[in-house]
Amino acid sequence: MMQTWDPRTYEKNGAFVPGMANEILQWLDAAAGERILDLGCGDGQLTARIAATGASVVGVDASPTMVAAARARGIEVLEASAESLPCGDACFDAVFSNAVLHWVRDQDAMMDEVRRVLKPGGRFVAEMGGHGNVAAISVAFSAVRARHADPGSEDVLNYYPTPQSYALRLSQHGFHVDRIALIPRPTPLAASGMDGWLRTFRSGVLNSLPEELRETIIAETCALLAPALRDENGNWTGDYVRLRFIATIPNG
């Protein structure tokens, strides 16, 4: 049931991910000469934007296909998981991450690694799914799968914490939380709508099913969600909630 990523599908159905990253990039406030790690860089769209500031940027991603897409942009990218970074100690001024951390299974190992690679005074700037993120989608998807005797384990696909719980977790790993916020962000989906969203962001679950059952589950999930998330013109809006934070490593 491992989630997989196809760069072309992601660009088609998930363009809103880099497209709605302006605010977290402002929080990062990258400067020329800084060395920055883009954790979960995907196809490298945001990595390239950070590099355009004059910062020296290295991307890391666990998906071989996404790593290849990012490298095609001329970006330096390492293929690795967030829980085991192939980087030296205290070598980055900042670690940046957008729409990735809620996919990380071992949050504690990830935080230890981020702290290890940051210089004293370095900052961890990230946006991820927060408490309540895609709640309607998740409930509908689970309900439809249960109807077809495939309850699965939707609850372990993603981790959507509250600001309070995540701030505590960061502090337990030696970070000082400078700023953290939970932000409701209704998100217009691509022209492919909920069908495309499910095929992209729940591919790990769907691809484990027989094709006929997969298509049935997609169709029934879309039908169940349409009254709440599709407007009269057929446009879909995802019920996104983002958790955004800046956490720093104390000097000395």
Tell me what each language-model feature is.
Residues 1-34, 45-49, 66-69, 123-148:
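Conserved class I S-adenosyl-L-methionine
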Residues 108-123:
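A short glycine-rich, Lys/Arg-flanked "PGG" loop and its adjoining helix->strand segment in the class I
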Residues 178-233:
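C-terminal helical/coil "lid" or tail adjacent to the Rossmann-like core of SAM-dependent
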Residues 159-173:
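Short alpha-helix
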Residues 83-94:
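A short acidic, Gly/Pro-enriched loop at the edge of an enzyme's catalytic core
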Residues 35-84, 109:
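Class I SAM-dependent methyltransferase SAM/SAH-binding core
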Residues 94-107:
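A short SAM/SAH-binding and catalytic strip from SAM-dependent methyltransferases
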